[in-house]
Amino acid sequence: MSDPQGDAPQLTHFVGGQPRMVDVSAKAPTTRTARAEAWVLLPPESRAALLAGQTPKGDPLSVARLAGLAGSKRTADLIFLCHPIPVTSAEVDVTLKDAGIHITALVKTTAPTGVEMEALTAVTVAALNVYDMLKATSKAIEVSGVRLLSKTGGKSGDYQAAERPPQP
């Protein structure tokens, strides 16, 4: 968390060098959103199997969507210092592109803390499920480019990531 005067960031999850969950009980619930992305880079043999509908475990794109939705709701179980918050909406898009499989998630809540980690967890869990579903076709599949694209709401204000070209 940054100081509004531009001073050095404060580490809010540590007190006396020990990890702790930040107390958000005094914060009012507000509407917050976060959008994240990830890429799954496919070697030619994995891409060919996907396009031919010959993936050993079924449709990885559909499974990835469901996995991403589940990941957004289970973030507090996986990221130790995250608060369990109500995910009021989650959308996960999984699209085959020339550069690979592009995964995006948009997560919303009305809570005293944000949903950035929920969006990032959604795309990461979705990407890992794609890897699992396609690993029989190649071990050279790569998960790449996991990042926060935007966030709205909260004390730290809105954020918009810089544009960048698709992953190679």
From Swiss-Prot:
It holds the Pfam family MoaC. The keyword rRNA-binding does not apply. Gene3D superfamilies: Molybdopterin cofactor biosynthesis C (MoaC) domain (3.30.70.640). It catalyses: (8S)-3',8-cyclo-7,8-dihydroguanosine 5'-triphosphate = cyclic pyranopterin phosphate + diphosphate. CDD domains: MoaC_PE. GO terms for molecular function: cyclic pyranopterin monophosphate synthase activity. Its EC number is 4.6.1.17. One of its GO terms (biological process) is Mo-molybdopterin cofactor biosynthetic process. Keywords: Lyase, Molybdenum cofactor biosynthesis. Pathway: Cofactor biosynthesis; molybdopterin biosynthesis. The keyword Lipid biosynthesis does not apply. Belongs to the MoaC family. Catalyzes the conversion of (8S)-3',8-cyclo-7,8-dihydroguanosine 5'-triphosphate to cyclic pyranopterin monophosphate (cPMP). This is Cyclic pyranopterin monophosphate synthase. It comes from Deinococcus radiodurans (strain ATCC 13939 / DSM 20539 / JCM 16871 / CCUG 27074 / LMG 4051 / NBRC 15346 / NCIMB 9279 / VKM B-1422 / R1). The lineage of its organism: Bacteria, Thermotogati, Deinococcota, Deinococci, Deinococcales.
